[in-house]
């Protein structure tokens, strides 16, 4: 039974339990999703970390299924990643070696849950395999690092062949690529995609037969004119022909878990929230983001449908989705020189419309799509200078447009059931992740990494990734203090997949997080003190040697003591210079960051 507590006119707690199997253990799939749901009052059951796909290990599909069966009786709803339950996880779906009979047996096991736990609605999500232009270590088959671009180009030409747009030159290029890529790699890549297609077709059939209360098919990094877009078109045609209604298909993967939790939330409350969409001047909803392959307005509409909502253009909506698109058609990367705070008339008008809505007590969720993989510094500058950072209900400007749209709608809906403090923490996490780190700090850390590799920068830690995580934490805490007014001791920052692409930010109100700037300062001071102590010890040893030996100072003992003293002095000088140089470089880089952002208020 659900118990809803009301505070200030909005629900802040619902005693419902959601069993959630994420597609891996990245923050956007696990920590951020579950923190949002728990802040909205839900108890969230998640599998042991050892079962989930991670940075350096595959997920355990069999163990995950057994865990679901052991805990399904405690749940009011289940939100399940089929990529995890079939392959082990999202990345595992791209590189597994499972046979079709094994995969079909796993799917049949999931299908039985509809009968075994008939009282528990199942919300499932899966993905169409992506067609990346290049490989990432550990997230694609190993051969993709070498042949990824060629495979991508070949698939793009095959798209033209399927759509009847292949020219004679294209045909020649296609056959050349087929000759360059080892046949076994092509067979492996297409065989795995075929398995994914067959299983996704079966999942659509399960949605038609009401095995799932709702099923979402995500297009993982789905740019136009790729193998992925061909497969999406085929599966959507199958769903349309079968008349499947409890189904949605749209770009993105990492937002799917949270989106379906929001769908379950609306179903629990028997609500169909109304959503009004606001765009700035420019291409607006017609914008086609680089990783999505379709117009923003189509992606937004599909996400609203997926949460059981209804898009409206008049009246008072339950949520205003403020989608900030680029003035022109392209969306570049956030960590570029173009991402500087220059207020435009379009940005000012957009912010005025948001303020007007919030003054009418209409919840506003901002979706920042100006850049891919991070926030727009201009939009954040406007929110900051107009004291509006905590005015919206939610903010998202991360990774792909589909990711940000899904999170923006999911958090925007669930925020109505949160306390004001939890909403503020949710916003702070997104600002520090999407804006501070993705749009600004990540580029800083990459520059420092190059300096370290070129021996221009003396690190505090010997292990490279430990040093990079320390630098990221130091800078994100600095942004938190200067721009958000947060105590650095409440901001934890890690690089959980030991790469710079994603960060994990956690707000810890108890204030038990070390301030990384102080930690790094202390490490350098301790190194200098250790070398000063070594100089003192060497000086004492030299004095003793001179006192015990002839006065000419040329005995072996005297020479060794003098050399040890000179080495200690030189080592101290090197460390002192390195520390001073590190301070200078860091100050220069922080000034450069300020040019990309703005000078904070004092």
Model-identified regions with their sequence ranges:
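Hydrophobic/aromatic hotspots within intrinsically disordered, low-complexity regions
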Residues: 523, 542, 559, 572, ...
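Long, low-complexity, intrinsically disordered segments
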Residues: 590-602
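An N-terminal assembly and electron-transfer interface module characteristic of large anaerobic redox
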Residues: 16-519, 596
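Short, charge/polar-rich alpha-helical segments
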Residues: 517-532
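Bacterial N-terminal signal peptides
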Residues: 1-8
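Charged, low-complexity interaction regions
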Residues: 543-558, 580-584
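Sec/Tat signal peptide C-region and signal peptidase I cleavage site
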Residues: 11-15
């Amino acid at each position: 039974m659900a118990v809803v507590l009301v505070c200030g006119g909005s629900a802040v707690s619902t005693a419902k339990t959601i069993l959630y199997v994420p597609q891996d253990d990245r923050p956007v799939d696990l920590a951020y999703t579950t923190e949002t749901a728990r802040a909205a009052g839900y108890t969230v059951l998640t599998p042991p970390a050892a079962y989930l796909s991670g940075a350096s290990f595959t997920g355990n599909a069999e163990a995950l299924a057994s865990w679901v069966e052991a805990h399904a009786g405690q749940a009011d709803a289940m939100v399940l990643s089929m990529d995890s339950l079939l392959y082990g996880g999202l990345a595992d779906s791209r590189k597994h070696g499972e046979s079709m009979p094994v995969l079909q047996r796993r799917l049949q096991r999931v299908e039985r849950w509809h009968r075994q736990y008939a009282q528990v609605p199942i919300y499932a999500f899966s993905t169409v395999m992506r067609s990346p232009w290049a490989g990432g270590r550990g997230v694609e088959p190993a051969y993709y690092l070498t042949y990824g671009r060629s495979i991508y180009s070949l698939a793009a030409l095959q798209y033209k062949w399927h759509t009847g747009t292949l020219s004679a030159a294209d045909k020649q290029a296609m056959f050349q690529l087929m000759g360059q890529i080892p046949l076994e790699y092509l067979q492996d890549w297409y065989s795995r995609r075929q398995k994914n297609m067959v299983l996704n077709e079966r999942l659509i059939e399960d949605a038609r037969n009401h095995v799932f209360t709702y099923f979402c098919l995500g297009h993982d990094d789905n740019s136009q004119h790729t193998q992925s877009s061909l497969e999406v078109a085929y599966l959507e045609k199958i769903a349309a022909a079968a008349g499947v209604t409890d189904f949605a298909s749209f770009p993105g993967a990492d937002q799917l878990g949270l989106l379906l939790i929001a769908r379950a939330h609306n179903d629990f409350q028997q609500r169909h929230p109304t959503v009004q969409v606001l765009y700035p001047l420019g291409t607006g909803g017609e914008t086609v983001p680089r990783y999505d392959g379709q117009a923003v307005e189509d992606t937004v509409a599909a996400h609203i449908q997926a949460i059981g909502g209804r898009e409206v253009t008049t009246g008072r909506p339950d949520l205003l989705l403020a989608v900030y698109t680029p003035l022109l058609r392209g969306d570049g990367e956030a960590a570029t020189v173009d991402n500087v705070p220059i207020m435009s008339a379009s940005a000012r008008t957009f912010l005025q419309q948001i303020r007007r809505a919030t003054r009418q007590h209409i919840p506003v969720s901002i979706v920042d799509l100006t850049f891919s993989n991070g926030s727009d510094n201009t939009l954040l500058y406007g929110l900051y200078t107009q004291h509006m950072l905590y005015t919206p209900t939610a903010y998202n400007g991360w990774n792909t447009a589909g990711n940000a749209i899904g999170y923006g709608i999911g958090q925007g809906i669930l925020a109505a059931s949160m306390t004001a403090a939890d909403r503020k923490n949710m916003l702070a996490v997104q600002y520090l992740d999407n804006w501070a780190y993705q749009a600004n700090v990540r580029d800083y850390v990459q520059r420092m990494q190059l300096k370290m590799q070129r021996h221009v920068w003396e690190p505090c830690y010997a292990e490279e990734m430990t040093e990079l995580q320390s630098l990221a934490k130091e800078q994100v805490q600095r942004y938190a203090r200067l721009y958000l007014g947060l105590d650095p001791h409440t901001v934890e920052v890690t690089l959980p997949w030991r790469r710079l692409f994603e960060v994990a930010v956690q707000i810890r109100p108890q204030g038990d997080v070390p301030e990384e700037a102080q930690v790094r300062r202390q490490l350098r001071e301790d190194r200098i003190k250790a070398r000063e102590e070594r100089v003192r010890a060497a000086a004492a040893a030299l004095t003793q040697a001179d006192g015990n030996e002839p006065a000419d100072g040329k005995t072996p003992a005297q020479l060794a003591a003098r050399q040890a003293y000179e080495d200690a002095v030189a080592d101290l000088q090197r460390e002192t210079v390195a520390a001073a140089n590190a301070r200078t470089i860091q100050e220069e880089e922080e000034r450069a960051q300020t040019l990309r952002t703005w000078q904070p208020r004092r």
